[in-house]
Amino acid sequence: MIPGEIRVNQALGDIELNAGRETKIIQVANHGDRPVQVGSHYHVYEVNEALKFEREETLGFRLNIPAGMAVRFEPGQCRTVELVAFDGKREIYGFHGKVMGKLESENK
């Protein structure tokens, strides 16, 4: 084995990211005067206010891109992006502090 080499069992086929999770597609426009970059696990609902989109629809969603990647929105640019629902406990903490807890109430 070569240092840094990754060996993959080809018989297993491709790995599908976020299989079975709820996804949605939205249009995002950067109305600011600076580029805005959004990382793979950032809660889209809480991104920079210069990014304009139907914000309420994005509660509990992140970009559907591989971990560690990001999407950059240049000033004046409009892009279509795919989102994927957060999984696990569905609790959001940090970011801009707009949620700070469970996404759904206990009654659901």
Curated annotation (Swiss-Prot):
Its EC number is 3.5.1.5. Heterotrimer of UreA (gamma), UreB (beta) and UreC (alpha) subunits. Three heterotrimers associate to form the active enzyme. The keyword rRNA-binding does not apply. The gene is ureB. This is Urease subunit beta. One of its GO terms (biological process) is urea catabolic process. It comes from the Bacteria. Gene3D superfamilies: Urease, beta subunit. Its main location: cytoplasm. Keywords: Cytoplasm, Hydrolase. It catalyses: urea + 2 H2O + H(+) = hydrogencarbonate + 2 NH4(+). GO terms for molecular function: urease activity.
